[in-house]
Amino acid sequence: MTKSYERLVQRLMAAGRYKEAEKWLKEGLRDIGEKWPGIGAGLRDQLRQMRILEQNWPVVAALQVEVFVRHPARQAFMECKKASDRAGVWPQVRESLLRYLEKGELPWQQKGWPLPASGLDRPDVDQRNRFPLVGDLIGIAILEEKPDQVLKWYDHRPKGHFGFFEIGEDAIATAVQAHAPERAVAIWKNQAERLIAQVQPRAYQEAVKYLRKAGEVMSTRKQQAEWDQYLESLRKAHARKRRLMEILDGLQGKPIMKKRR
């Protein structure tokens, strides 16, 4: 039966008995933290709450970095930023987190690491990971609005790999369309063509969304003629797909954006 360490720690914290709470928290981590990852995460978060009450921002940041190493994600990255900003060390921490995602080097083992030990056992590198963690690097580049880095890591993706966990190619194209409109158009076209290749009416409807996005960008770049030529090439390549022809009829020969009066 799972021991109720989280409830005990919460009661002790509510009573202001923080030393006892920390003692039982660490006991719980030693006892069941690895067997029950969810409980372990809850106990570590309770320690983070204690350090926040103490306004011990360097340790709060160190704990948050450990969360990020265990489960890299954009939200965890932002939590690292919040705590590290309070500690006045975000630029160094940011570089170390990105280096971890790229090289697999644990942040606290890197030269010049600015944060203290958290007081808990630090996680090891997950051996299932294959660095660089391209999806996470793309996600953070989108978060930081760095389209050049989005493209850098998008181009680093494994061949034939079209999905990045929760990050879709539509989000990638949207993130880079102002910086590199031709790349955004190419991504949307590729998405549409892969959907068309499924030879399913539902996929055609999905494809048209990406075709419209590509067409809008081409129109703003005064490439309406090229857009029409592209649609005509699709018609010739897929002339037997009647439902697709109907959809393309709704696109071809019509400006994607209304002309200004």
What kind of feature is each model-predicted range?
Residues 1-261:
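Eukaryote-biased, non-catalytic alpha-solenoid scaffold regions
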